[in-house]
């Protein structure tokens, strides 16, 4: 392909928020204009270089690698330079120079290289002195021609004939101002000129959208006066346009072609590159065989002891295990993967040695006996029937991939160890790129174009949300009618707004969608290289870390030859670690290494569906499945973990029925019974598919893995080929063709969603471990769970409810008991706290003298003490500060004592308000409302007190002689106010739920609580009436339209319901505020997937009660109390209430000490919320 011009100044969206072009688009544009080559020259980085090279080569376009860098020529003298790789040496130097801009210590000035860096790494590079942004252009703009010539000579001296002057014509004044002088200097110094054009968007019509992109970059609106702009000419000009533009400088056009001919390197894939594990003259093959055999012997000694295996059987097992070990080792060594296994084994052994909990396995790697022997996994693959070929297939060579779960809190320690062992320059994290996806791009563009927030928010809500497959804006406009109308300029149905502006927002968003917006770091991926990373890939450093980060995404890092290791932080392992620590403090040691999975208490708990906090078994549907399954072995837990997914879930009833002998298993063929017996005839695992192919059709396990993959992908051609092989092999095994075809079809159906048994088994073990801890040590386990969820108040509520269900006492937040984190106190633990109110009601002056401290002993029960760090606005560090002060100087005696003893900087109004609302000072002062209203004065007192202490002016004066801190006068808050104080400060109701008072009434009105909902209601579709306090409201969109989810609570639990009907939303909008008390009539669907509630109508609590006739049985203790009841009821018959309202009272006992008042209220009788609080004191 011949061309008369090559673009050298093309930027992609890897120049974040500067270019509106993707890699694919720039290549397509070059091909469209019949260019044989294209230079990608992003600003400051080579993040897209390998992606660009591979895509360009695929499309038969020559890729040229360039980068625009800032270079420091002198103190405070910075300018841009475009560097282009001529050959492989040049590309490697380009990697080093671009990486230096991120890794230099003086990045605070700007991302740049020094002139000395260019001298050091100039080999193989072509340099273009950027036009107005380059050093020569900047000097000319400053009217310093002598300086311009000086810097040009310096660059020419270093680069020789590899140094060019760039010239641009975007019709900008600054370009025209320097052009003549610029060309003159080039001529005098014999420096060739190349014509370039900034390529930031595809065509001139995209200038508007690109301008919006620049505004997004700067965080300003389009009306902002002093913002960055670029010429409308920064588009992908054709060769003809460029020739015409530079018709007076034909050599500048020709030089782009000449320069292209000097470049002959393209970034390419590399084979995997690992560091040498051993620094001595010992082969990795020798080491892995040695360590694996030693490790297997140690594993078997533990196994034989734990399982009490006879000596005779031990020898037989040794032969079986070592045969499998040697088979795996031969494959691993032949594939040259010994080093990989040794590296993984080394950092896992280090972790375990240093007390860092590592998961038993994850993914197919748990199927390897070598991995088990090297302590990479803790799962016996032969015992659990796991296959090595599922992990490493000798018939399909690919890199092994161990994903390792670590205790989340100590994962960084393992990474630091790897860095120290292999070198900081050879270990790195992996970059990820955030893109402008549909919802985000609408928000960005709407902000720039000043679309009202309400309209912008509504627009984004119209885009359906999918975490797995994000919906594009184009797709959303096709599928959501209201969006489609808005895109046509018809505005929004439910909102007033400028229809044309809304259309412009959508049009612009469609253009910018998919562009890179920013970079971040992969959550788990770590690469370890055999050489410095910068020799292979671009690297950079995040501002928050000193660790190198590979500048290619995960996909392109692996293509470049880097080996990825996933260091995953699993929160459950942190729960286990912290629970074991709590137990160790009590002298209880837990060792899971030789666990036999036969604890009856554990299975009894699971059979009751008590899955809260148990790994994998926390969902409502899972808990229901546990109750029906009644698991009694680890194999049941593994199977349920694999089955509980869309697709396989439909086989749960079959598995349960066969387990409980209510149905006969179908093994498909007698030869398959040994394979399917464990799962009652249900094909659950991918390994079962492999074994079926091996036993029935003569496949090798490697070939069977290829069959499994084909079945999973459902590619028709592959399936037809595999079916032919399967049937042919089965016929050779004396199975009829029709039966073979039938079995193939059945297995293929299961294989489509079959689960990796190695992964299921490893995670089943973690499930068992958490269940064991919960069943045997519930308080310690739940405290460990709580302390990882300090900011998740829904989870805290869930765990505390579970604690109550287990008979564990909960101590509300208390400034003299609580710590930064949740804590557990066992029986006979002494808890010291104040018991006497320190301040009389409505007293305006704090009295710190009248204090009584008492010790409480909680016998024969565990107690969980609420964490200060779980209160909103309060951190665990503040909790530690409080705890340390208590340990040093004793319990706080009053709120002034508290304020005086803590540094004033540690206490602010919001923190103090929330501590008060949460009830932390209830035992120091019995009027929470009074303290809350006095916060400003308390904060003022804190400031003045500490100022006086610092000045030492009052060092000899007693505190009581200072000006008194005045509390405002206040009555006591009612129970509901206090309950909502707690909700506002902790996100939950801890001492009293607003609906507690109504439970007796609700039971008479057939209003269910959530305990009944989950435990008594049969499966199927029903209608129920529930009552709850709205705790959270969230509006969402689906393809069918808007819907709202509500999170509510009652005294028993938290539940979620959905409102799909716009009519329901409209009719009851006045009742749907957070903190509203409502009764809801809803449809309920209860099945294996859990419980789904759909709201049909709402009532306020008052209306719900007063619209029904019901009966109350009250127990006044005397005539005075009876008179109070009658007075209350009489008061509700007047004042606008219906005159025919009736309340009938029956005295069932004449004994004055044992009144029983039976009250029947008519449908028209009206009671208020506060009435039930009064009446409830007489309900037994």
Swiss-Prot record:
Pfam families in the cross-refs: DNA_pol3_alpha, DNA_pol3_finger, HHH_6, PHP, tRNA_anti-codon
A Gene Ontology cellular-component term: cytoplasm
Gene Ontology MF term list: 3'-5' exonuclease activity; DNA-directed DNA polymerase activity; nucleic acid binding
Keywords carried by this UniProt record: Cytoplasm, DNA replication, DNA-directed DNA polymerase, Nucleotidyltransferase, Transferase
InterPro entries xref list: DNA_pol3_alpha_NTPase_dom (IPR011708), DNA_pol3_alpha_thumb_dom (IPR041931), DNA_pol3_finger (IPR040982), DnaE2/DnaE/PolC (IPR004805), DNAPol_HHH (IPR029460), NA-bd_OB_tRNA (IPR004365), PHP_dom (IPR004013), Pol/His_phosphatase_N (IPR003141)
Compartment(s) where it occurs, according to its Swiss-Prot or TrEMBL record: Cytoplasm
Keyword Cytoplasm in record: yes
Catalytic reactions of this protein: DNA(n) + a 2'-deoxyribonucleoside 5'-triphosphate = DNA(n+1) + diphosphate
Disulphide linkage map: none
Coarse class of the protein's main subcellular location: cytoplasm
Entry EC no(s): 2.7.7.7
GO biological process: DNA replication
UniProt keyword annotation of Cell inner membrane present: no
Job of this protein: DNA polymerase III is a complex, multichain enzyme responsible for most of the replicative synthesis in bacteria. This DNA polymerase also exhibits 3' to 5' exonuclease activity. The alpha chain is the DNA polymerase.
Sequence similarity: Belongs to the DNA polymerase type-C family. DnaE subfamily.
PANTHER family: DNA POLYMERASE III SUBUNIT ALPHA
Complex formation: DNA polymerase III contains a core (composed of alpha, epsilon and theta chains) that associates with a tau subunit. This core dimerizes to form the PolIII' complex. PolIII' associates with the gamma complex (composed of gamma, delta, delta', psi and chi chains) and with the beta chain to form the complete DNA polymerase III complex.
Listed name of the protein: DNA polymerase III subunit alpha
Organism this protein belongs to: Rickettsia typhi (strain ATCC VR-144 / Wilmington)
Organism lineage: Bacteria, Pseudomonadati, Pseudomonadota, Alphaproteobacteria, Rickettsiales
Gene name per UniProt: dnaE
């Amino acid at each position: 392909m011949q061309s008369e011009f090559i673009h050298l100044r093309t930027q992609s969206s890897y120049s974040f928020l500067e270019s509106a072009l993707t890699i694919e688009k720039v290549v397509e544009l070059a091909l469209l204009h019949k260019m044989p080559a294209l230079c990608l020259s992003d600003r400051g980085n080579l993040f897209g270089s390998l992606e660009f090279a591979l895509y360009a080569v695929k499309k038969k376009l020559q890729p040229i690698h360039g980068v625009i860098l800032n270079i420091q020529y002198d103190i405070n003298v910075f300018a841009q330079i475009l560097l282009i790789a001529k050959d492989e040496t040049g590309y490697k130097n380009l990697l080093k120079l671009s990486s230096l801009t991120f890794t230099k210590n003086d990045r605070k000035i700007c991302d740049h290289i020094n002139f000395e860096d260019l001298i050091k790494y100039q080999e193989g590079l072509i340099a273009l002195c950027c036009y107005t942004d380059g050093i020569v252009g900047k000097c000319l703009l400053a009217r310093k021609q002598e300086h311009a010539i000086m810097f040009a000579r310096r660059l020419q001296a270093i680069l020789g004939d590899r140094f060019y002057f760039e010239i641009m014509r975007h019709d900008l004044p600054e370009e025209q101002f320097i052009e003549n002088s610029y060309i003159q200097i080039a001529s005098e110094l014999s420096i060739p000129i190349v014509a370039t054009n900034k390529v930031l968007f595809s065509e001139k019509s995209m200038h508007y959208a690109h301008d919006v992109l620049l505004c997004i970059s700067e965080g300003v609106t389009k009306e902002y006066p002093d913002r960055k702009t670029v010429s409308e000419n920064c588009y992908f000009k054709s060769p003809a346009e460029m020739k015409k533009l530079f018709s007076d400088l034909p050599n500048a056009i020709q030089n782009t072609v000449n320069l292209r001919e000097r470049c002959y390197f393209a970034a390419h894939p590399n084979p995997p590159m690992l560091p040498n594990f051993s620094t001595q003259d010992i082969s990795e093959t020798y080491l892995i065989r040695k360590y694996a055999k030693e490790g297997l012997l140690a594993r078997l000694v533990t196994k034989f002891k734990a399982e009490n295996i006879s000596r005779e059987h031990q020898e037989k097992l040794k032969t079986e295990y070592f045969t499998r070990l040697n088979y795996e080792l031969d494959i691993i060594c032949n594939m040259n993967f010994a080093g990989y296994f040794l590296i993984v084994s080394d950092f896992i052994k280090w972790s375990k040695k240093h007390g860092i909990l590592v998961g038993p396995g994850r993914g197919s790697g748990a199927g390897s006996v070598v991995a088990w022997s090297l302590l990479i996994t803790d799962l016996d693959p032969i015992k659990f029937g796991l296959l090595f070929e599922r992990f490493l297939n000798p018939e399909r060579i690919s890199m092994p991939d161990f994903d390792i779960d670590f205790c989340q809190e100590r994962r960084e320690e393992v990474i630091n160890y790897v860095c120290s062992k292999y070198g900081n320059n050879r270990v790195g994290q992996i970059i990820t790129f955030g893109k402008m996806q549909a919802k985000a791009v609408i928000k960005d563009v709407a902000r720039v174009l000043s679309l009202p927030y309400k309209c912008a928010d509504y627009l984004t809500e119209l885009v359906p949300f999918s975490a797995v497959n994000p919906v594009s804006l184009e797709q959303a406009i096709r599928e959501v009618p209201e969006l489609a109308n808005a895109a046509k300029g018809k505005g929004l149905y439910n909102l007033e707004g400028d229809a044309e502006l809304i259309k412009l927002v959508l049009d612009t968003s469609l253009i910018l969608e998919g562009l890179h917006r920013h970079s971040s770091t992969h959550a788990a991926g770590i690469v370890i290289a055999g050489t410095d990373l910068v020799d292979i890939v671009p690297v950079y450093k995040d501002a928050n870390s000193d660790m190198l980060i590979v500048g290619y995404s995960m996909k392109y890092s692996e293509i470049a030859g880097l080996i990825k290791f996933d260091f995953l932080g699993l929160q459950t392992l942190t729960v286990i670690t912290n629970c074991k620590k709590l137990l160790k403090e009590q002298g209880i040691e837990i060792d899971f290494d030789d666990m036999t999975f036969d604890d009856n208490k554990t299975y009894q708990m699971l059979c009751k569906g008590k899955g809260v906090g148990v790994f994998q078994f926390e969902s409502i549907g899972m808990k229901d499945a546990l109750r029906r399954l009644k698991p009694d072995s680890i194999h049941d837990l593994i199977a349920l973990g694999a089955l509980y997914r869309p697709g396989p879930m439909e086989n749960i009833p079959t598995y349960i029925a066969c387990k409980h002998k209510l149905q006969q298993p179908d093994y498909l063929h007698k030869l398959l019974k040994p394979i399917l017996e464990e799962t009652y005839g249900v094909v659950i695992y991918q390994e079962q598919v492999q074994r079926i192919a091996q036993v029935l059709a003569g496949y090798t396990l490697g070939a069977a893995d290829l069959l499994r993959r084909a079945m999973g992908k459902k590619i028709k051609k592959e399936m037809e080929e595999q079916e032919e092989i399967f049937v042919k092999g089965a016929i050779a095994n004396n199975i009829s063709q029709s039966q073979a075809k039938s079995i193939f079809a059945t297995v293929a159906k299961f294989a489509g969603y079959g689960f990796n048994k190695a992964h299921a088994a490893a995670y089943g073990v973690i499930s068992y471990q958490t269940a064991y801890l919960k069943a045997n040590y519930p308080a310690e386990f739940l405290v460990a769970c709580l302390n990882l969820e300090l900011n998740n108040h829904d989870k805290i509520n869930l765990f505390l409810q579970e604690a109550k269900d287990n008979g564990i006492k909960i101590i509300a937040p208390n400034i003299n008991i609580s710590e930064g984190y949740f804590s557990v106190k066992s029986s006979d633990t002494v808890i010291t706290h104040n018991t006497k109110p320190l301040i009389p009601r409505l007293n305006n002056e704090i009295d710190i003298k009248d204090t009584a401290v008492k010790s409480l002993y909680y016998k024969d029960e565990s107690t969980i003490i609420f964490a200060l760090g779980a209160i909103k606005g309060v951190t665990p560090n503040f909790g530690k500060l409080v705890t340390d002060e208590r340990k040093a100087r004793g319990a706080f005696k009053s709120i002034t004592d508290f304020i005086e003893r803590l540094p004033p900087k540690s206490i602010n109004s919001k923190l103090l308000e929330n501590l008060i609302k949460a009830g932390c000072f209830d035992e120091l002062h019995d009027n929470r409302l009074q303290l809350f209203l006095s916060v400003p004065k308390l904060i003022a007192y804190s400031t003045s007190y500490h100022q006086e202490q610092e000045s030492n002016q009052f060092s000899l004066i007693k505190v009581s002689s200072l000006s008194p801190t005045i509390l405002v006068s206040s009555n006591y808050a009612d129970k509901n106010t206090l309950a909502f104080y707690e909700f506002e400060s902790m996100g939950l109701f801890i001492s009293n739920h607003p609906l507690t008072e109504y439970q007796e009434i609700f039971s008479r009105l057939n209003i269910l609580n959530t305990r009944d909902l989950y435990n008594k209601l049969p499966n199927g579709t029903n209608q129920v009436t529930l009552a709850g306090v709205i705790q959270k409201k969230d509006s969402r969109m689906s393809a069918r339209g808007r819907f709202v989810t509500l999170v509510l609570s009652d005294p028993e639990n938290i539940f979620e319901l959905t409102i799909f009907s716009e009519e329901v939303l409209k009719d009851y909008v006045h009742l749907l505020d957070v903190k509203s008390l409502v009764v809801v009539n809803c449809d309920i669907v209860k099945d294996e997937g859990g419980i789904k509630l759909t709201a049909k109508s709402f009532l306020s609590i008052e209306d719900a009660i007063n619209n029904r006739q019901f009966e109350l049985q009250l127990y006044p203790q005397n005539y005075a109390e009876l008179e109070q009841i009658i007075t209350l009821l009489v008061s509700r018959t007047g004042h606008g209430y219906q005159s025919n309202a009736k309340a009938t009272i029956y005295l069932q006992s004449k004994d004055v000490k044992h009144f029983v008042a039976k009250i029947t209220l008519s449908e028209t009788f009206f009671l208020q919320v506060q009435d039930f609080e009064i009446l409830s004191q007489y309900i037994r």
